[in-house]
Amino acid sequence: MTDGAESPVAARVRAESRAWIEANWDPDLSLVEWRIRLADSGWACPSWPSRWCGRGLPASAADVVAEELSRAGAVGVPDGVGMRLAAPTLLEHGSDDLHSRLLRPTVTGEITWCQLFSEPGAGSDLAGLTTRAVRDGGEWVVNGQKVWNTSATHADYGLLVARTDWEVPKHRGITYFVIPMDQPGVEVRPLRQMNGHASFNEVFFDDARIPEANRVGEVGQGWAVALATLAHERRYAGMGPAAPSGAAGRATREAGAERAVVYEPYQWYPQRAGRVDLVVERATATGANRDPVVRQEIAQLLALARSAGWTAQRARAARSLGRPPGPEGSLGKLAASQVARAASRVHTLIAGASGMLDGPESPEDGTIAEIFVSVPAVSIAGGTDEIQHNIVGERVLGLPREPDPSHQLPFRDVAKNPSAWRDRPSGDKG
């Protein structure tokens, strides 16, 4: 929230939500039981319509309730693809049927989601995707491959963009779907990363089926829906680490049963790496703070972190005012990438050669090495830094787009020989 006196509406929301949380929060409840109680109250998503776990309040109410949940040490709504991407996209573009079937169980955590956008040949140029969906009666049959998907191993549903028309330019032949993941035609394979983890997956579709009722938006108009999802993704990336209630709103497994247990926030390494207080603490403990080069790197990290913080505040303020995601999300994501890279530099500078070690005898139990190998992903995931620069240049600075006549050709012609268009000077195309 921004500085200044709290509005009467915010004060009322704070008082009412605090009273309800104090009367109802019980850490001995199972996670699902608590989230069902929260959803029934309307405090789960206070700015949503009352029929979908909300209270029809202004968008700013969500931040107030999140603060009150955090103050009480209570669990909030699930944090991840479901609430960050799927729910807002469905609210904006989904049918009433999708709302009634999917919104509430997303809020309670009874269903989970993954995002199925990128392909081996369509990452930054997402509109060049070739996964196809063909109508078959009341269903769509999907064949193709997606990659770099988180949560796909355990997701119930996926947000899928697929090509349904090859005879029109690439942006106009895409349709957006909600695909059930638990079916014979969907195969998920984890991808091993250089840090030893398998946080991402590749997903293969072999005659997978989607009910017509799971289409989001009109046939061939999926690019606009996909842009809405990507805008929400950039907004959250630009807002920085999750708010305390978001970090508190995750669960651990205790004695074999899900319990609403609050755990230490900032456990994702790149986010934790950017905490300047932790960097200063380690530099002081090792004596590296006496090195002027280290002090200069810490000062630069502090400046970048402060700048990123102000950008994140702009993104949060825009959301609280109910504004649609804008270019501040791209600016925030770029700022987060800069902070992560600067943090990686100073951490490895402080640790020296020992920072390359892994295991219990390495600095911070291998955290330094983990930061070093994980941070590059921050500049790629959710849209590369180059894509964010393009968005800022075109939508903030008003710079012209690079000419690309292939955008006017039927995608079938472009897909047959993409290098012929990619390698020729723009003046020779067409």
Which residues make up each language-model segment?
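A short core secondary-structure module
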Residues: 143-191, 201
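Short, charged, amphipathic alpha-helical segments
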Residues: 295-300, 327-334
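Amphipathic, small/basic residue-rich leader segments at the start of a protein or domain
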Residues: 1-80, 85, 101-105, 112, ...
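Internal helix-loop-helix
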Residues: 40-109, 151-157, 305, 312, ...
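Alpha-helix capping/hinge segments and adjacent helical runs
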Residues: 9, 26, 149, 330-430
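A structural signal for short hydrophobic beta-strand segments in well-ordered beta-sheet cores
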Residues: 131-134
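A short, Trp-centered hydrophobic/proline-enriched beta-strand micro-motif
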Residues: 109-117, 161
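Glycine-rich beta->alpha junctions and the first turn(s) of the following alpha-helix
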Residues: 186-306, 378, 417-429
